[in-house]
Amino acid sequence: MDTDYGTVHTQQSVKGNTLILLIYFISFIVGFPGNCTVIWFTGYRWKKSVTTIWFLNLAIADTLFVIFIPFEITYILMGHYWPFGLFVCRIGSLMFNTGMYASIFFLTFISIDRYCLAFRRDICNKYRYRINIMVMIIISWIISILLSTPYMYFKNTNEKYRNNRDCLEDYHSDNNTYLLRRVVFCISLVMRYLVPSVVMLFCYCLLLFKHSLFLSKGQTYTIVIMITSFMVLWTPYNILYFIDVIGSHYYNADTIIDAAPISISLIFLSSSINPMIYMLVGRYVSFENYSMRESLKLILSEERDNQTNHENEIKMENIN
C-alpha cells in the first residue's frame, strides 16, 4: 500500500474513482479557502496569543495537505498517469507527510493545552508563554520534516509495472530498504496515530466528564466533533497502514487496493474539517447572535478563554 498523495491505483473501479474525486473536490474547495481564512485572521488580523498561535500553525499544516490536491485530481482524470515529473512527485510527498505530522502534533498540543487550562493552572502560569509555545512549534515542524524525509527520498516516478507513469514509493530494491520501510511505517503509526489518539482521548474525555460544568455548549460540541472527526477519518487509513506493516500474507491484496485510496482521500478531507468545525459551531451553536467573523474570533482567540475562565470562577463561587 502506498501512503502518499500520488498513490491511487488503476485497479480502482469507476465508482471508486468517482467517490475519491468527489472527496478531493470537497477537500480542496472547502479546505483551501477555509484554512487560508484561519491563517489570515490568526496570523495578521488578530492579536497574537497562545491560542491563536496554535490554530495558525494547525491551519498552515492543513494547508500543506490540500495544496497538492489539484495534482492528484489531474493524475486520476488522466487515467492514473503522473505528468508532473520526479521533482513535483518528491516535493508533494514531503509537503503531504510534513503537513500530516504537523497537523496531528498541533491537534495533540491543543488538547494538552485545553487540559492544562482546565486542570493544571499551575503549569499554565509557569510555562504557558508565547516564547515557550514558539519553541515547541519550531521543534514540531523540524521533527515533522525529518520524519517525512524518508518518504521523499524513496519516492520515484515508476513505469516498470505498465506503460504508464506513477508517483510511487520504491522500497523494493533490496532487503535493507524494505526493512527500513517497515521501521519508518512503525514509527509513523506510533507518532501520528497511536500516541496522539491516546493523548486526545484522555484530555478531551476528562474535559467532558469532569469539567463539563465549566464548558460552554459551543466548546462541548467542538470537543465532541473534533474527537469524532479525527477517529472516523484517520482510523481506516491507519488500520490499513498497520496491515501493510505486518506483511502482505496477512491480508487480501485486492481488498487493500480498493480501500487504500479511499482511506487516503479521507485524510485529505480531514484537512478541511477543522475550520468548518470552528465556523459552524461558533455560528449555530454557541454564538448565534454574532457574525461569522466574530464567532470565529471568539473560538480561536484568547478572548473566549478569558471569558470562560471568568464564568468558571463565578460557577465555582456558586458551588462553594
UniProtKB/Swiss-Prot annotation:
The chain crosses the membrane at residues 19-39, 53-73, 92-112, 134-154, 189-209, 223-243, 261-281. It is a multi-pass membrane protein. InterPro entries: ATII_rcpt, Formyl_rcpt-rel, GPCR_Rhodpsn, GPCR_Rhodpsn_7TM. Residues 40-52, 113-133, 210-222, 282-320 are cytoplasmic. Its main location: host cell. Disulfide bonds join C89-C167. Glycans are attached at N175. The keyword tRNA-binding does not apply. Coiled coil: none annotated. GO terms for biological process: phospholipase C-activating G protein-coupled receptor signaling pathway; positive regulation of cytosolic calcium ion concentration. Residues 1-18, 74-91, 155-188, 244-260 are extracellular. PANTHER family: CHEMOTACTIC RECEPTOR (PTHR24225), G-PROTEIN COUPLED RECEPTORS FAMILY 1 PROFILE DOMAIN-CONTAINING PROTEIN (PTHR24225:SF24). This is G-protein coupled receptor homolog FPV021.
